[in-house]
Amino acid sequence: MAKYSSKINKIRTFALSLVFVGFIIMYIGIFFKESVLLSSLFMILGLLSIGLSTVVYFWIGMLSTKAVRVICPGCDKETKVLGVVDMCMHCREPLTLDKGLEGKEFDESYNKKKMSK
């Protein structure tokens, strides 16, 4: 079985990686001190990456406030569920809001909307 984590944590990790990528891009710009154009370009690209991470953090914060809070049966801690199926943030227990999916193997494809005929 593949390693899963909660959707909120995945998006937060992506936003954090954007911050570090932005710093690395800006650091690369230091090596081009002789060329003002290249140095400025790398600094602006790094700043855009950090700005994008701020937007992602804001978006996941808004999304997190709308997430359904449930008590995980595995660890008895409160966690948030985005979509029909998700993982517990604390113990990675598969969670579902759909009674028809209880007992089935965890699959993130259950969150995708099915095409209606």
UniProtKB/Swiss-Prot annotation:
It comes from the Bacteria. Keywords: Cell membrane, Membrane, Transmembrane, Transmembrane helix. It is a multi-pass membrane protein. The keyword Transmembrane helix applies. The keyword Zinc does not apply. Its main location: membrane. It is found in: Cell membrane. InterPro entries: UPF0295 (IPR020912). One of its GO terms (cellular component) is plasma membrane. It holds the Pfam family DUF2614. The chain crosses the membrane at residues 13-33, 41-61. Belongs to the UPF0295 family. HAMAP family: UPF0295. This is UPF0295 protein YgzB.
